[in-house]
Amino acid sequence: MRMAAVLLVAALGTACATEGAGPTGTGPSGTGPSGTGAAGHHGRQGQGQQAQGGQGQQAPQARPRTASGALTAYVERYRRAHAARTALARKWGLRQVPLLPPDPPKAKPEITFREGFEVGDPDLPPVFTTVPTRDRVVFLTIDDGAEKDPELLRMMSELNIPYSAFLSDYLVKEDYGYFKRMQDLGVALHNHTLTHPYMPALSYEEQKHEICGQQDVIERRYGKRPTLFRPPYGNYDADTLRAARDCGIKAVPLWSAEAFPDRMEWREWDRDLHPGDIVLTHFRGRGDWEGSMADMVRQAMDTITERGYAVARLEDYV
């Protein structure tokens, strides 16, 4: 609602400027829920100009839109957009309409190691659980690739909820096409190793094979080499981060909370969300959970929205 109020003020200001323009001023312009509308430009033809038929006449003037008219038009556009989002939230069983995130930051914040997660070399890819931001946003990430539920793709696309996927090839290779459809819907695909091992038990070379091998798979199958990596189970050592760096990884996001169909689990003592928190979940279904992927999304989104947060795209900040 705060965003709506800001946009209403912007629309009113634009309309007032239009109303004060003379006959040679610009035509109406305004902002809508999805961006800035284009302004038309209406000039005045000179008096006595000969029309094509030879009779002198003045071109008709476009009447400038009044402030109240522009505001009414904006409110109607906003009302329709909100009604559509409300209908989709109801369709998918959400208790509230998800909040919209702010525009992405013009400059991405500097990512550093979370305190206590360092391995002694500050030049290695940083391990973190929260993105440094004052925006009331969190980031939804989904790991591994075991469950390939088409309902998840429809739900997230219709609700326009951004998320990121961290994939392991031993699960993804059962249906590479599912994750290509996900990518085509705007989801970024990242590295979660080839076979999902406990990384600290492996040598540097073995860890490098797991990470670089998955880099190669994702690049070959999906056309882009990831820069983000999440170690299986969140476990890593200095060799893990050295191997990740040598495979082209820039950062290692872990998580602050984990979402299930029936609950949230929390890393922090206050059991709450904070600006920039990363939320983990998994590609799972009724075989592993008491619910489906859609049930998990409903529970997570209700929690996130009720606590006053929007879901933003991780790659816009990292």
Report the location of each language-model feature.
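Secretory targeting and sorting signals
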Residues: 1-36, 58
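Active-site beta->alpha N-cap acidic-glycine motif
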Residues: 97-191, 195-198, 217
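Intrinsically disordered, low-complexity repeat/linker tracts enriched for polar/charged residues
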Residues: 23, 28, 41-63
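Acidic-and-aromatic substrate-binding clefts and catalytic sites of carbohydrate-active enzymes
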Residues: 145-148, 167-175, 198-205, 230-236, ...
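His/Asp/Glu-enriched short active-site or ligand-binding loop at hydrolase and phosphoryl-transfer sites
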Residues: 235, 240-272, 309-316
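C-terminal domain-boundary segment and adjacent tail
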Residues: 124-133, 173, 291-318
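CE4/NodB-like, metal-dependent polysaccharide N-deacetylase domain
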Residues: 157, 161-162, 188, 197, ...
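Structural recognition of the beta-strand scaffold that forms the well-ordered cores
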Residues: 138-142, 163-167, 188-191, 227-230, ...
